[in-house]
Amino acid sequence: MNRRTRALTVLACALLLPLAGCTTEHTDRPARTPDDTIRAATLTLTDRCLTRQGLTPPRPGQRPANRAEEQRVAAALFGRPPAELSLTLANGIAVRAHTDGCLAAAQRTLYGDQKRWFQVSTVVNNLKPEAAHRDLSLASVRVRHRAELTDWQRLRSRALDASTRVLHTTSH
């Protein structure tokens, strides 16, 4: 098989392989983890948002047309400065996020309360560093942040339900 034939074969497989499962029932697919479900819905929502603005959603390995396009996509996806949400961690590092942009809109759709999700997810994602910084056990830091952990579970459960709906409406 020469290089050209091999390249065409690979291209054909790449184009047809995604269609191979199109006739199977949804139950034949492996179940997504909750994290994968939320990530997939977030990607779906951010892609829709960018597309509505006439922008091409970024993909791994795909380069933007030019620097200006890359900046437009980044601003639309992540929001424009200044960041409206901020939380200072136990170690003094400030974490910031935007309330505008496609990612923020997706978070509002999935979690309901973007500001509270930002606060609790930042705290929960930094429990181990806080324990190390304060020289405390992780268990004692978890007790200290019981309210944030409870809210994290509630908001994440809401996001999982919303994500399932987003993906269900996308697949039909």
For every predicted segment, state its role.
Residues 2-12, 16-172:
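Mitochondrial intermembrane space
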